[in-house]
């Protein structure tokens, strides 16, 4: 079932930001963003769902990258193939955990790094989940502000924030309304 578009904002130059409710694995984009940890161990949350759908090659490639380069710091992003998924790649954004400090800035940094990975590969459309809001427990108000600020300078044609859970949807839509752009 296609995602429901809940809000749209047009950022200059020509970036359409859409807040949608649906399944990240079915998004009509070139690449999706994964909510990752620094070890790229995709066991739980969005990462676990994505990894199981992609097949073992996604985790194997992630393990190889971490073995060669070491753990990734909070605020960074790295690209892997998408395995069995219908995307050109998966961008793994390492968001902050609540309590480590400067969560809002680190979350913005992780998403900006993810969008930069997409631009470097010539990808024009990406969809990202509610990074850091689940098992990393960053408060939804902080996440919502970071999501909107990071997209403003994404320099991509279409950026979609794909959400599932009602509390996250409500928090993001409230932030969109606060910014007066819905």
Language model: regions and residue ranges:
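Glycine-/small-residue-enriched capping loops at alpha/beta junctions
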Residues: 2-120
């Amino acid at each position: 079932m296609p995602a429901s578009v809940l809000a749209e904002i047009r950022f200059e130059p020509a970036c359409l930001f859409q807040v949608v409710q649906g399944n990240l694995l079915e998004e009509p984009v070139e690449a999706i963003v994964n909510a990752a940890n620094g070890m790229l161990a995709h066991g739980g949350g969005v990462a676990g769902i994505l990894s199981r759908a992609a097949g073992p090659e996604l985790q194997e490639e992630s393990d190889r990258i971490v073995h060669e380069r070491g753990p990734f710091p909070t605020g960074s992003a790295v690209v892997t193939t998408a395995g069995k998924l219908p995307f050109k790649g998966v961008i793994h954004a390492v968001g902050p955990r609540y309590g480590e400090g400067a969560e809002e800035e680190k979350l913005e940094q992780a998403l900006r790094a993810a969008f930069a990975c997409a631009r470097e590969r010539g990808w024009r459309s990406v969809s990202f989940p509610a990074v850091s809001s689940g098992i990393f427990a960053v408060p939804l108000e902080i996440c919502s502000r970071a999501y909107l600020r990071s997209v403003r300078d994404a320099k991509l044609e279409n950026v979609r924030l794909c959400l599932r859970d009602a509390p996250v949807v409500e928090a993001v839509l409230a932030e969109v309304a606060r910014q007066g752009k819905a």
